[in-house]
Structure formats: structure tokens, C-alpha cells
């Protein structure tokens, strides 16, 4: 899709975003991912603090804490998925929003669902690189919502087949 920007400018931005996942603020979240991606972390203030004041989330009411932001695409060479994640009042983008993006990419690109340990860590705000044995998404019942037009997409059959091979290889390596 031509957005009217010079290709050299778009390529520079894409390269910088890939750098964020390789050596930048989300490098730990995407460590070991079998696909390349590009992303940008962000933090948005929910309230203004004084010029001389130091930000301390622990001293603020939850509704006053910074928002965690992350935009990303994958695979980097030929993007199939682009997303934006906003986690209200959660803090730094690399700590909360980027791990969610990793799980979405793993689901959509690899057909993998987080392990129970990973879900428990995420609920405590401790998510980073996936932990535990990821499960095939096809083995996890998909919870349907009341509005059937608002259900998440299921991975394609080719993704599921590739995922079974990836899980088998990862299990054999452990």
C-alpha cells in the first residue's frame, strides 16, 4: 500500500523498529522468537507531574499511572500482522504491552498458545519472554464471545501444521 512516503524513509523506520526487538527496549521479550519483528515501545502519562517532581508509580493511584504502549509488525521481511497494544495505567511499554504483542504474534504466526505458567506470570505483571511449554492453539478451546463477529481469528491449517513441527523440535531440544 502506497502511503505517499518515500520508500527510503519507510525502510529507515522499519529498520529502526526491527532494531527495537533485536537490541532495544523489547529485545528480552522477543528473544528466541523464530520470526523477526519490528516494534516501538511507548509510555504515555495519565497525569501531569511537576517539573521538579520525580515520577513514582507506587505513590500514585492506579488511575494516575502511566499507560504502556507498543506498536509492532511481523514477520519483518514480509509483514502479515500489524498491531497496537495499549495497557492502561500499567507503566513502561516494554514491561507490559510488548509481552502481549509477543503472545499475539506467537498465536497468529505460529499457532501457539501461552503456557499456564506464562499466563500466571502475565496476570501478576511479570510477563517477558514466554515461559513454560507453549501449547498448540488448536488444543486450547477458543472461548467465544457474545458477538460472533468479534471473535479472534483462528490460525490457519498451514500455521497449525508448522507449529506442531516447531513444538516437536523445541520439546526435543529441551
Predicted features along the sequence, with ranges:
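Active-site beta-strand/loop architecture of penicillin-binding DD-peptidases
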Residues: 1-2, 8-115
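Short, solvent-exposed mixed-charge patches
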Residues: 172-174
Amino acid at each position: 500500500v502506497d502511503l505517499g512516503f518515500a520508500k527510503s524513509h519507510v525502510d529507515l523506520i522499519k529498520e529502526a523498529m526491527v532494531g527495537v526487538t533485536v537490541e532495544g527496549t523489547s529485545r528480552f521479550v522477543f528473544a528466541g522468537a523464530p520470526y523477526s519483528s519490528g516494534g516501538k515501545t511507548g509510555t504515555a502519562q495519565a497525569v501531569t507531574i511537576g517539573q521538579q517532581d520525580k515520577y513514582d508509580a507506587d505513590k500514585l493511584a492506579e488511575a494516575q499511572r502511566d499507560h504502556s504502549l507498543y506498536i509492532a509488525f511481523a514477520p519483518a521481511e514480509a509483514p502479515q500482522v500489524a498491531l497496537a497494544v495499549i495497557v492502561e495505567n500499567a507503566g513502561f511499554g516494554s514491561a507490559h504491552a510488548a509481552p502481549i504483542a509477543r503472545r499475539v504474534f506467537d498465536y497468529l504466526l505460529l499457532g501457539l498458545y501461552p503456557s499456564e505458567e506464562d499466563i500466571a506470570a502475565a496476570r501478576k505483571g511479570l510477563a517477558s519472554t514466554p515461559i513454560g511449554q507453549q501449547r498448540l492453539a488448536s488444543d486450547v478451546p477458543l472461548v467465544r464471545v457474545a458477538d460472533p463477529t468479534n471473535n479472534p481469528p483462528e490460525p490457519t491449517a498451514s500455521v497449525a501444521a508448522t507449529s506442531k513441527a516447531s513444538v516437536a523440535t523445541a520439546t526435543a531440544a529441551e
